[in-house]
Amino acid sequence: MRKINFSAGPSTLPLEILEQAQKELCDYQGRGYSIMEISHRTKVFEEVHFGAQEKAKKLYELNDDYEVLFLQGGASLQFAMIPMNLALNGVCEYANTGVWTKKAIKEAQILGVNVKTVASSEESNFDHIPRVEFSDNADYAYICSNNTIYGTQYQNYPKTKTPLIVDASSDFFSRKVDFSNIALFYGGVQKNAGISGLSCIFIRKDMLERSKNKQIPSMLNYLTHAENQSLFNTPPTFAIYMFNLEMDWLLNQGGLDKVHEKNSQKATMLYECIDLSNGFYKGHADKKDRSLMNVSFNIAKNKDLEPLFVKEAEEAGMIGLKGHRILGGIRASIYNALNLDQVKTLCEFMKEFQGKYA
């Protein structure tokens, strides 16, 4: 029997995708070989590669103003690639809402970029999304859409006149996005859209001009990958294959509007379980900024019970509920592939646990 996986990433995958990958693992579409065994230069793989890029653009309803790049190195490599490629001679502005924005700020500073932190919620342990106003003349404005550790999420992105950069790693493909002022939108795909080893970057084509005439190593230059259709070097072929299956699955769900509707239902159910517990459970994030993806909470009346909660949950068939080492507590990551019944199972367990130990 499969466990219910609440891991923050790599995370649970739709069972039908796993079964299709299993079916095709040794014999891809009856061809007598695995997708993992063939050259990335073959027509067979190119159909997967370019098909995945087109489906990703279709889900976000993007036109040809945007290039889709498949890169390696995780979202963490983007912390350096973004300032390396997109910083000019001005200020790069960041909103600091958690560990991942702190890491991004650090990488930009290492490169000698003029970084300005225009808003931060660090003083309250990142329990909310701070009000942010970016200037009109920065090289770019940078935010992290969703914060896996602290369970906060932008409900709407800031309106900016300067190019907006969005790290969407943990709410990738979970809702529709207004791209009107987004210059670069990126994430590792291993939470909501595939397996580890692949990052997907949507970059507005005019931003690629910034990479020209810069002394950047070829592998770290966005223009290199755009001009070579993300085939400059051997890409992570199996991760792209899995991403392609995920794109098909999301389209078959009815697109991102339907996916968002289901995600909202799951989150509402879980937050109600916390809020109606008479203080036994307490969420970390301010209610107005709660994440639909990552629900971080404590057993407020007795935090010593939290390891027992995780242990008994595992015995009941639920894994991945231990909170991040920085914040502690309990965290339920309820990404796209988790269904409503699985979240309901967690809520029922939470009520039973409260009944035993309150």
UniProtKB/Swiss-Prot annotation:
Chain residues that bind pyridoxal 5'-phosphate: A75, S76, W100, T148, D167, Q190, N233, T234
Known catalytic reactions: O-phospho-L-serine + 2-oxoglutarate = 3-phosphooxypyruvate + L-glutamate; 4-(phosphooxy)-L-threonine + 2-oxoglutarate = (R)-3-hydroxy-2-oxo-4-phosphooxybutanoate + L-glutamate
Record's subcellular location: Cytoplasm
Positions that bind L-glutamate: R41
Recorded GO MF terms: O-phospho-L-serine:2-oxoglutarate aminotransferase activity; pyridoxal phosphate binding
Residues with the N6-(pyridoxal phosphate)lysine modification: K191
EC number: 2.6.1.52
Cofactor note (record): Binds 1 pyridoxal phosphate per subunit.
Cofactor: pyridoxal 5'-phosphate
InterPro entries: Aminotrans_V_dom, Pser_aminoTfrase, PyrdxlP-dep_Trfase, PyrdxlP-dep_Trfase_major, PyrdxlP-dep_Trfase_small
GO cellular component, one term: cytoplasm
GO BP annotations, alphabetical order: L-serine biosynthetic process; pyridoxine biosynthetic process
Source organism, top-level taxon: Bacteria
Keywords annotated in UniProt: Amino-acid biosynthesis, Aminotransferase, Cytoplasm, Pyridoxal phosphate, Pyridoxine biosynthesis, Serine biosynthesis, Transferase
Gene3D superfamilies: Aspartate Aminotransferase, domain 1, Type I PLP-dependent aspartate aminotransferase-like (Major domain)
Family the entry assigns: Belongs to the class-V pyridoxal-phosphate-dependent aminotransferase family. SerC subfamily.
The protein's role, per its UniProt record: Catalyzes the reversible conversion of 3-phosphohydroxypyruvate to phosphoserine and of 3-hydroxy-2-oxo-4-phosphonooxybutanoate to phosphohydroxythreonine.
NCBIfam families (UniProt xref): PRK05355.1, serC_1
PANTHER family: PHOSPHOSERINE AMINOTRANSFERASE
Record's subunit section: Homodimer.
Name this protein carries in UniProt: Phosphoserine aminotransferase
Species: Campylobacter jejuni subsp. jejuni serotype O:2 (strain ATCC 700819 / NCTC 11168)
Gene that encodes the chain: serC
